[in-house]
Swiss-Prot record:
It comes from Caenorhabditis briggsae. This is D-aspartate oxidase 2. One of its GO terms (biological process) is aspartate catabolic process. PROSITE patterns: DAO. One of its GO terms (cellular component) is cytoplasm. Selectively catalyzes the oxidative deamination of acidic amino acids. May play a role in the egg-laying events and early development of the worm, in addition to quality control of the germ cells. Transmembrane segments: none annotated. Its EC number is 1.4.3.1. It comes from the Eukaryota.
Amino acid sequence: MLPKIAVIGEGVIGCTSALQIAKAIPNSKITIFHDKPFENSCSAGPAGLFRIDYEENTEYGRASFAWFSHLYRTTKGAETGVKLVSGHIQSDNLESLKQQQRAYGDIVYNFRFLDDRERLDIFPSPSKHCIHYTAYASEGNKYVPYLKRLLLEQKVEFQQKNVENLDTIADAGYDVIVNCAGLYGGKLAGDDDQCYPIRGVILEVDAPWHKHFNYRDFTTFTIPKENSVVIGSTKQDNRWDLEITDEDRNDILSRYIELHPGMREPKILKEWSALRPGRKHVRIESQQRKTTETGKEYTVVHHYGHGSNGFTLGWGTAIEATKLVKKALGL
């Protein structure tokens, strides 16, 4: 009998997990359950610049970087959304930049600290310290649909369904359930209260000449996409509201103009807000469970809590999640 595997969530983590499982267990039947159209998900808007927040996730990021490198070499960026981009992160806090160096300095290309002449020449109001590097960015509105096309080629099915209880999926005949529900992963797990929303707002502006990313202290940034430049952001913990306010716009634009005075009054093409899945650590864990109604035994593999690093870490963490799925099936 073919193993039946359910993946909860069709964002970048769910699709990445399903793709790796499909490749590792080609005789499996995989269904991805999602509660909303992809366009309304947290994975639809990000520019996907490679950057790691915490050193504990370095090896996950290294695996993802190798995957993006493969895509960049072999497939058109117009299809994958993956491109190579250079830029800078500024801060008055030298230790925060050294932490970035420890987290991914030996993964990305050309990582280095700028000297004073470079800082003063490039930036109108430079911070005291600045790093430069080159890395891949994976645009959510292209990269995840590309993964979905690969999944359809693997005969993976998609079903829009609001899953509120894992037992109902197990009782429907699934042997393993992979919980990639993002912000709602903890609630769906039923045993995890460590998840919290990180409210994010970005604006997409018309600035085709702007080719480099630029961060200041990880909250103010500009990142070029294919047809626009993303500027942001807000990182507001434990806020659930998604409506973009004038306060949001004015705050982002004022910080942005300080970084790039030559781009005053930018033409705004699009606004986007989402709730990032905050958690102190990414959860990658398997559990044996038994349904309440029928007593059926099944395995749930939790794979959620990536915060702002879903695109950067997703391929690497999915490797670990897939190992747990194979173990659950005795493979």
